[in-house]
């Protein structure tokens, strides 16, 4: 099975200032103008495969034509590279988790809006131990994971749930490509990762998932992010992408031949089969209905989640060397409230476009 490219980690301490300078120097990022051609970057992950299908099935083009614009949906093989390219202004939008949206473009000064909340991980990310099914037994162990990733965040939340901290374990930085091989070796007894690697780890002898993202529902969120200035100058981009997304959702969530074909094509594009893809969907809380996504983004959940995320990011230097507190980057929510600096809002949750979809107003 091909491993997911949803690597979702980067050490931004030496990178943030350079990305900020580059982003501000590029046209199309600062002082965005009205235009009719756009580029969206996506990478392989269960919740983002709909963009592959929407592109190949002509759904994105159909909705772009409706608003008399062009949208080029581009697969980037490396997730972090896609975020760096977006942050540098080479793309108008990108598929991204909530944590990385804060830690990469927002922390680098690129004002970013999340018009589509696609899903949240509901078991796709987990902590695995050998020889025990009790999370308490993690104390004193070496835990292999992709450092500064959502797996690292998940470990921190797992430890917090049993009144421990990272001082009670030793984090061993391990790439997502190496995590399965590492865990299969005799000397490795603990790991944190995401699917499809997680499914491989849990199937190994004497291995148990002792904590997963279903224990913190709604905290690892998968989104489509757009440059705020580009979106404000070109609201038809948000309308076209949202319209396309929910047409794709309607197709892939159906049990008829159209739905099976859509999920099969997504599976093939992800390097797996229909069964493998559907097993990943089973641990993903997809928002197939726009109204459900609106309910989620207008609830208290995003603010509660981002409080945890920004503390994690600040404590590990992900908000940049100049950040003196977690308040450095302001985060705006659907009701207009702001967490952090109101003078430096760089990440925005919104229900505007999903509400249009729910009301069939696109």
Where are these regions (language model features)?
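Soluble non-cytosolic domains of exported or imported proteins
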Residues: 77-80, 145-153, 177, 192, ...
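Bacterial N-terminal signal peptides
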Residues: 16-27
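Signal peptide processing junction and immediate N-terminal pro/mature segment
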Residues: 28-32
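Conserved C-terminal helix/tail region of periplasmic/extracytoplasmic solute-binding proteins
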Residues: 309-362
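Short, glycine-/small- and polar/acidic-enriched structural segments
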Residues: 33-173, 182-185, 189-195, 218
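Secondary-structure end/capping motifs
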Residues: 233-322
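Bacterial N-terminal signal peptides that target proteins for export
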Residues: 2-17
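Pocket-lining segment of extracytoplasmic ligand-binding domains
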Residues: 177-274
């Amino acid at each position: 099975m091909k491993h997911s490219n949803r690597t979702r980690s980067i050490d931004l301490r030496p990178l943030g200032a350079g990305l900020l300078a580059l982003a501000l120097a590029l046209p199309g990022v600062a002082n965005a103008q009205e235009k009719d051609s756009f580029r969206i970057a996506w990478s392989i992950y269960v919740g983002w495969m709909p963009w592959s299908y929407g592109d190949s099935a002509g759904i994105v083009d159909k909705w772009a034509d409706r608003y008399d614009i062009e949208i080029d949906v581009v697969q980037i093989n490396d997730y972090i590279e896609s975020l760096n390219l977006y942050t540098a202004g080479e793309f108008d939008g990108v598929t991204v988790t909530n944590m990385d949206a804060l830690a990469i473009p927002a922390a680098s000064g690129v004002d970013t809006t999340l018009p589509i909340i696609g899903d949240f991980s509901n078991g796709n990310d987990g902590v695995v131990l050998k020889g025990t099914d009790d999370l308490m037994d993690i104390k004193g162990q070496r835990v292999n994971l992709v450092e500064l990733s959502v797996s690292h965040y998940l470990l921190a939340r797992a430890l917090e749930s049993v009144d421990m901290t990272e001082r009670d374990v030793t984090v061993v930085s391990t790439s997502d490509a190496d995590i399965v091989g590492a865990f299969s070796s005799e000397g490795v007894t603990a790991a944190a990762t995401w699917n499809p690697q997680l499914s491989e780890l849990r199937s190994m002898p004497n291995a148990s998932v002792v904590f997963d993202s279903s224990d913190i529902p709604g905290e690892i969120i998968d989104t489509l992010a757009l440059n705020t200035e580009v979106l404000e100058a070109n609201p038809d981009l948000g309308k076209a992408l949202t319209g396309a997304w929910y047409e794709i959702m309607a197709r892939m969530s159906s049990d008829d031949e159209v739905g099976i074909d859509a999920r099969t094509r997504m599976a093939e594009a992800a390097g797996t089969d229909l069964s493998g893809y559907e097993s990943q969907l089973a641990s993903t809380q997809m928002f197939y209905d726009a109204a459900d996504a609106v309910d989620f983004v207008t609830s208290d959940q995003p603010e509660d989640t981002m409080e945890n995320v920004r503390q994690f990011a600040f404590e590990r230097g992900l908000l940049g060397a100049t950040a003196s507190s977690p308040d450095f980057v302001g985060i705006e929510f659907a009701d207009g409230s702001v967490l952090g600096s109101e003078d430096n809002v760089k990440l925005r949750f919104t229900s505007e476009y999903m509400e249009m979809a729910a009301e069939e107003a696109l």
